């Protein structure tokens, strides 16, 4: 008899009361571990082991956004999940990040996280400390968009760093079973054909 067990989509471990120096040692220990995301803020470390499904959504989001930037003739730099840090205060690895337009700084204009575990919105404080203007969470098949105002993130319906982007089209395409059809549909939608 074969028994199939549902595997968790992502695995998450959070540990409090960790110093920055301890975090850097943990970070060093995971330096050659693919599929691991590390976060640090307020003496708390989060270690996230991402699933194949997580990576599929992450890559599809990036791929479709790159298609959008190219179609709309928008300069961009895809930063992927590079480690964003500020002093000894905060470290984050978004699933995808982008510098948009002529931006040349180290702080992305947009960071995106795929969330299969809890804690999406609570992660905003990390990005606020980093000064990231806009953060998107892909959770339960929909995007939650947040734009940084003077002292906090505000939930928004439409991206302010990419106001012409149809978020509903992007979401719909991400949920399509065929990746090829999803890309074709998205390209048709953004080109107006």
Region locations from a protein language model:
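Gly/Pro/Ser/Thr-rich low-complexity, intrinsically disordered segments predominantly at protein N-termini
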Residues: 1-130, 137-193
């Amino acid at each position: 008899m074969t028994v199939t067990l549902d595997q968790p989509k992502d695995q998450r471990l959070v540990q409090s009361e960790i110093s920055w120096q301890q975090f850097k040692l943990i970070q060093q220990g995971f330096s050659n571990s693919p599929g691991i995301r590390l976060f640090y803020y307020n003496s708390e470390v989060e270690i996230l082991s991402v699933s194949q499904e997580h990576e599929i959504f992450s890559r599809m989001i990036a791929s479709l956004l790159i298609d959008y930037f190219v179609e709309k003739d928008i300069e961009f730099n895809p930063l992927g999940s590079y480690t964003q840090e500020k002093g000894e205060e905060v470290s984050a690895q978004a699933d995808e990040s982008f510098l948009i337009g002529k931006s040349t700084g180290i702080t992305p204009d947009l960071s995106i996280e795929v969330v299969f575990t809890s804690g999406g919105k609570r992660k905003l404080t990390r990005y606020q400390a980093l000064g990231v203007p806009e953060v998107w969470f892909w959770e339960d098949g929909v995007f939650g968009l947040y734009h940084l105002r003077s002292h906090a993130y505000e939930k928004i319906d439409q991206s302010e760093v990419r106001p012409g982007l149809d978020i509903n089209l992007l979401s719909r395409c991400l949920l399509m079973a065929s990746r090829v059809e999803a890309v074709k549909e998205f390209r048709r939608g953004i080109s107006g054909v």
